[in-house]
UniProtKB/Swiss-Prot annotation:
Protein name: Uncharacterized protein ycf19
Gene source species: Guillardia theta (Cryptophyte)
InterPro entries listed in its UniProt record: CCB3/YggT
Key words of the record: Chloroplast, Plastid
Taxonomy of the source species: Eukaryota, Cryptophyceae, Pyrenomonadales, Geminigeraceae, Guillardia
Similarity comment: family membership: Belongs to the ycf19 family.
Places the protein is found: Plastid, Chloroplast
């Protein structure tokens, strides 16, 4: 039973790591104004990441016109990854 939990936790952490990379790409691309968010692959990227990022918009107001709310998203995702990793190691 322990092996199945280990596999489950490691798979979930792998998914979260991939999602974290997608978030990083999405946030990095917002610095390029010529990105067409309605063309592929950018449309798919925004559809995958925007629901998560929208949870944090409005919590922190933009500073000097820069939206820093994705930082909260990164921090929360890292905390979840750490918690899941610790649970997986202890089981």
């Amino acid at each position: 039973m322990s092996n199945s939990f280990t596999l489950l936790f490691s798979s979930f952490i792998g998914f979260l790591q991939i999602y974290l990379i997608l978030l990083l790409i999405r946030v990095s691309l917002t610095w390029f104004p010529n990105v067409n968010w309605y063309g592929q692959p950018f449309y798919s990227l925004s559809r995958i990441t925007d629901p998560y990022l929208k949870m944090f918009r409005g919590i922190v107001p933009p500073l000097i016109g820069i939206d820093i709310s994705p930082i909260l998203g990164f921090i929360l995702l890292q905390c979840i990854m750490q918690i899941v990793s610790n649970i997986g190691l202890s089981s």
